[in-house]
Curated annotation (Swiss-Prot):
Listed SUPFAM superfamilies: Trypsin-like serine proteases (SSF50494)
Organism per entry: Staphylococcus aureus (strain MSSA476)
Molecular-function GO term, any one: serine-type endopeptidase activity
Entry protein name: Serine protease SplB
Residues forming the catalytic site: H75, D113, S193
GO biological process, one term: proteolysis
Gene assigned in the entry: splB
Function: Serine protease that cleaves specifically after the sequence Trp-Glu-Leu-Gln.
Gene3D superfamilies: Trypsin-like serine proteases (2.40.10.10)
Family (UniProt): Belongs to the peptidase S1B family.
Keywords noted in UniProt: Hydrolase, Protease, Secreted, Serine protease, Signal
KW Secreted (keyword) present: yes
Gene Ontology CC entries for this record: extracellular region
Compartments (UniProt record): Secreted
InterPro entries reported in the protein's UniProt record: Peptidase_S1_PA (IPR009003), Peptidase_S1_PA_chymotrypsin (IPR043504), Peptidase_S1B (IPR008256), Peptidase_S1B_tx (IPR008353), Trypsin_dom (IPR001254), V8_his_AS (IPR028301)
Length: 240
């Protein structure tokens, strides 16, 4: 995809956080969009990997990248401050991996929509494996790369409050990878911002941040592709 196409595509999309209220409610189990091959599945058990790597904000999603450290979008973290709370892999009213306080927020200095958030190690509300954040979550590892045609999955909390913090997994093909941009055909909604974009081995290729406004067979979703520079920034800001 050339830069002009990327710019035009980005101009036509909207950032989907639950603050906007844009989007439609997910079906209970599986939804398919014929040509785009978009599949959305409700996650039944969030206490197994890769779901133990995902966390919920009040209005969006994040995921674990290291000790006491999660990743989300800048447009998500700007609505939070030190002392606010995140919940590790909640599963509606069936429990979660604990509730934790934010202790530090570090935004990526470039244009990419990436923000590192460090949390207090000890839970405000314990998870199934005690009060330690790192005992209740599983950090993701990076993929070697990604290319057009490969299948990816986006795991997150669309309309988290409306859907009672039920986790959903959406799959589809990669359309293009260029620089720090990855475009894919996977159904995402308000609240999916900050979701991990994973390959078939559940390895990180990027972070979701937006989707086209249109809701048809040609609707694409957009993520930040993890370049060496972005990986370096994340590594330097993992809690010690």
């Amino acid at each position: 995809m050339n830069k002009n196409v990327v710019i035009k595509s980005l101009a036509a999309l909207t950032i989907l956080t639950s603050v906007t209220g844009i989007g439609i409610t997910l079906v209970e189990e599986v939804q398919q969009t014929a040509k785009a091959e978009n599949n959305v599945t409700k996650v039944k058990d969030t206490n197994i990997f890769p779901y133990t790597g995902v966390v919920a904000f009040k209005s969006a999603t994040g995921f674990v990248v290291g000790k006491n450290t999660i990743l989300t979008n800048k447009h998500v973290s700007k609505n939070y401050k030190v002392g606010d709370r995140i919940t590790a892999h909640p599963n509606s009213d069936k429990g979660n991996g604990g509730i934790y306080s934010i202790k530090k927020i570090i935004n990526y200095p470039g244009k990419e929509d990436v923000s590192v958030i460090q949390v207090e190690e000890r839970a405000i509300e314990r998870g199934p494996k005690g009060f330690n954040f790192n005992d209740n979550v599983t950090p993701f590892k990076y993929a070697a790369g990604a290319k057009a045609g490969e299948r990816i999955k986006v795991i997150g909390y669309p309309h988290p409050y409306k859907n009672k913090y039920v986790l959903y997994e959406s799959t589809g093909p990669v359309m293009s990878v260029e620089g720090s941009s990855i475009v894919y055909s996977a159904h995402t909604e308000s609240g999916n911002s900050g979701s991990p974009v994973l390959n078939s081995n559940n390895e990180l290729v990027g972070i979701h941040f937006a989707s086209d406004v249109k809701n048809d067979d040609n609707r694409n979703a957009y993520g930040v592709y993890f370049t060496p520079e972005i990986k370096k920034f994340i590594a330097e800001n993992i809690d010690k």
